[in-house]
Each structure stands twice: as C-alpha cells, then as structure tokens.
Amino acid sequence: IVLTASQPFTTALIASNMREFKYCWIWDKVRGVGFQIAKFRPMMRTEDVVVFGNGNGALATYNPQMVERDKIKKSKCYSSSDSSPLAYNDGLEREYTHKYPTNVIEVSNASQKGKVHPTQKPVALMEYLIRTYTNEGDVVLDNCMGSGTTGVACVNTGRKFIGIEREPRYFDIACRRIEDAQRQARLIA
C-alpha cells in the first residue's frame, strides 16, 4: 500500500497502522507550491509517500529503480572463499554504473499539462512507484483515482488497473485519460 500525504496527515496516517508501516519516501516536486500563502509559511516543495505492507518485508515486491552514476565506480571484488575483507582477488575488478535509489524521488510537478484535479500527481511519479512495487501484469488499485493518473501510469507500465472515484466529473475525466493512454499504447505497439 502506497499513499501520498503531507503533515500533519502523514503522522496520523502512520499512527493509524504502526504494525504495517514500513517507511516513507520524500517526493521532491522541484518547484514549491502554495504561493498564495507564502507570506505566512514556507512554500511546500516536498510531499511524503508512505509505504505500508503486511507481514515480512522480504516477501513484498520491491524492484529498486537503479540510478545511473555520474561517474563509474570501480572496485576490486573480495574473494568469496576468504573471510578477510582485506584479501582481494587479483585482477577481479567490477564497474558499477548504477546505484540504489535513496528515499528522495525527484519528479517535477511543473510540467503537468492539462492538470484537471487539485491533488493530481505527475504520471512519471506514479510510473516510478508502480515499477518499484509491482511487476508487469499485476493489478493496481487506486481507491481515490481523481483524474486517473495512476491508471495512465498502469497503461504505460503494463499493469492492470482498478480505479474508484466518487465524483462523476472526475470519474469521466479519468476514463477519458486512461482511454487516451490505451490508444497511444496501441499506436506504439
């Protein structure tokens, strides 16, 4: 279960189920929001992405989205048969071109063409989270689908999607956006 939130709701959300809370990501929106109240408080540039899961974390799907290194790291490999970390196998050098992600996801909210919902997220953010926590062909549920961004991201990443939205206006918008994404996917395929 992956939910987005901001304080103080983040704290209440985590406290609601401490047993299944795993960790938080920080979504860096690159550009601050809330300019209307900037005279009274800092503009908000980040939002929390709260991850929950039941049972053993080792059983949950986690596909880390590796980040390309600016500079290739070269390192000598340790011998698997030698217990000393100082003993190198001569000539075995490995190049590391990627690194594991940190808990900060930088996805700009500035380039959201046609934003139609007040809490609409960028498709790229949802694609990142979907690739991280699901495999192709999995089913993703969005019980507050708003304008359908998660559904669009599911189409783009080869996942199935179930969306729930109580506002008929937003439900219609979501259906149109998802159908458009499906048409685009068929054109590319």
Residue ranges and their predicted role:
Residues 1-173:
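Core catalytic lobe of class I
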Residues 176:
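Acidic/aromatic/glycine-rich contiguous surface patches that form carbohydrate-binding/processing clefts
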Residues 179-189:
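S-adenosyl-L-methionine
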